[in-house]
Amino acid sequence: TIIAVKYYGKSTCRVIGGEPFQVDDAYRSLRNGAIESNSSTNTIADGLKTNLGEVNFPIIRDGIEMIVRVTEDEIVKAMRLVWERMKIIIEPSSAVAVAVLTKKKKLFHEKKIGVILSGGNIDVDDLLFRLHQNSIPAPRSKK
C-alpha cells in the first residue's frame, strides 16, 4: 500500500496503518526507531502475526504517518460490521483497517478514504469461540 501510494498517489495522500495490540511490533518499532519483535502471537488477526523485517521496516518508517492499535474485540466487531452491512466476509487481518476507521472516526471525518478489504481466510471455529468468549453476539442470519 505504501509503495502504491508513493508511486500512484497524490502528495496529499496519507497512509495510516493498524495493528492489534498483541502484535504491535511495527507501532513499537516506529516509536523506538529500531525493529522490535513480538513476544506473543495471540491475536485473531493471524495474517499480522509475523514480525517486522529489515526490508519492510524502512518502507513503513518512511511511508506511514501513524499506526493505530486496536483490540481483539474491535477487530471482531469490525468483521461483524462488514458482514452485516456489506455482506462481505473479510478476514480478521483486513478487519483491523475497519476497526481503525471506527475507532478514530474524527480523524477520518469528511475525508476521502481508501481501505483494502481482503478475503475470507478465517478459522470459523476460532471466531465463533471468540464471539462467545467476548460476549459479542454472532452475526444474525437473514431467513
Can you say where each PLM-predicted feature lies in the sequence?
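PLP-dependent amino-acid enzyme catalytic core
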Residues: 1-143
